Amino acid sequence: MQKFNYHTHTRRCGHADNNMTDEDFVKEFIKKGFTKIAFTDHCPEKEEIDHRKNMRMKYSEKNEYLESIKSLKEKYKDRIEIETGFEVEYLPGQEENLLELKNETDKLILGQHFVYDDKNELKIFRRRYEPFEDVDFLKYAEYIKIAIEKNIPNIIAHPDIYMLVTDTFGKTQETVAHIICDTAEKYGIPLEINLSQPVAVLKGERDKIMYPCKEFWKIASEYENLKVLYGIDAHWREQIELYEKAIEVANEHIGQDIINKLHFCNENLEVE
């Protein structure tokens, strides 16, 4: 069982448990026997590009966030390894800011929640938020490809999140999967099986899993050198508590035959 997690949020993002401190998260991971974690809260933006106000920390909170995690890293160094990081989105023109964030931290995970459409307006991967055209799905793949080529992320979070806005895994969705898998394999960047929706199913908050998407991971399983890992996407205590059961739900949803063909990496992001 994977005992590291590189997808952890904090109350600063505005949509996590406001009653949990950074240290509370650390204690929960220690309680579950984890040996290494990275805090990767939604990154601050120098310009206002948010699709809702409770999406990410303020830029003025960045230094306090990093200092808090560094303090916990030292305090708990004999019990668990802790890294600093951010979850980021790639947008054209943001490369300098993203590479600056990478230089300040241990891990950057790319969780692409939106793209610019042909009218230069943000289109968000949120269920029934707005219609998505083929060009929007392909733009999503293009952004991830460019970000990887520019050496921005260490990990791609929920690469199949684009399935939130469609019930069909058609030719375009298949093309998106291949672009992401091709690029990630070429550059050695792991793809994350996200556990947030499996936890939501366990808690009775939803009855259908949109991602992880079985068809996406079937394609991923065909790549001989593509790295994979699980990500809790922790915003709440229960997501850590239900970790093992969430993996079981995700594996059952994807299919154990597919899971067995995937190449899971260790805490150093290497396949043994």
Indicate residue ranges for each PLM-predicted region.
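Short acidic/His/Gly/Ser-rich catalytic and metal-binding motifs that mark active-site loops
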Residues: 46-49, 117-121
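A short helix-to-beta-strand connector/capping loop
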Residues: 78-81, 104, 152, 224-226, ...
